[in-house]
Design a protein with these regions (language model features):
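Conserved SAM-binding loop
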Residues: 1-35, 48-65, 124-132
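Short, flexible, glycine/charge-rich loop motifs used to bind or transfer phosphoryl groups or to couple energy/partner
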Residues: 9, 37-39, 116-117
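A generic fold-level signal
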Residues: 13, 43, 120-122
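Active/binding-pocket-proximal capping segment
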Residues: 14, 38, 74-76
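Short glycine/proline- and charge-enriched loop/turn segments
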Residues: 33-43, 84-91
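Active-site rim elements
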Residues: 44-46, 115
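Short, well-structured beta-strand/strand-turn elements
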Residues: 66-70
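A C-terminal cap/extension of S-adenosyl-L-methionine-dependent methyltransferases
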Residues: 71-132
Length: 132
């Protein structure tokens, strides 16, 4: 359990810094709720916790850690691309429409994802913490 691990680390004098990588509650979660037939990347059984910026701040404060560096990033727009592509295939729409969708969105993926990352609404975060 994450709380138990943080509690142990808090009292370990050999630990000064901590690096974590956690999945976050992001756009991908909503896409998975709307597309139950498409493979779930965020909500699958391997992830027992999804965090928000607020929940991470709360738990770090509780256990005596402060953020010294963070990198918010994700594949939410790739997930959006995948979910829409799968849905288009299932609707048996024209192949031309599927090709057009793929052509149009590919060049936008990085810019769209960057905006989500800037708002800390992406599917992952890597954080370096310092014990205070």
């Amino acid at each position: 359990h994450p709380r138990e691990a943080l509690n142990e680390l808090r009292y370990n004098d050999n630990v000064k810094f901590l690096y974590i990588s956690v999945p976050t509650f992001s756009l991908s979660v909503y896409l998975e709720i709307f597309s139950p037939e498409t493979f779930h990347r965020q909500l699958h059984g391997g992830h027992t916790h999804l965090y928000t910026e607020k929940s991470l701040s709360y738990i770090f404060k509780e256990f005596g850690f402060e953020i010294i560096a963070e990198w918010w990033f994700g594949t939410d727009i790739v997930d959006l691309f995948r979910h829409i592509s799968v849905t288009l295939e299932k609707t048996k729409c024209s192949k031309k429409l599927v090709e057009l969708w793929r052509q149009d969105i590919i060049s936008l993926i990085d810019a769209m994802q960057l905006e989500i990352d800037k708002k800390h609404f992406s599917s992952e975060v890597h954080i370096v913490l310092k014990k205070i």
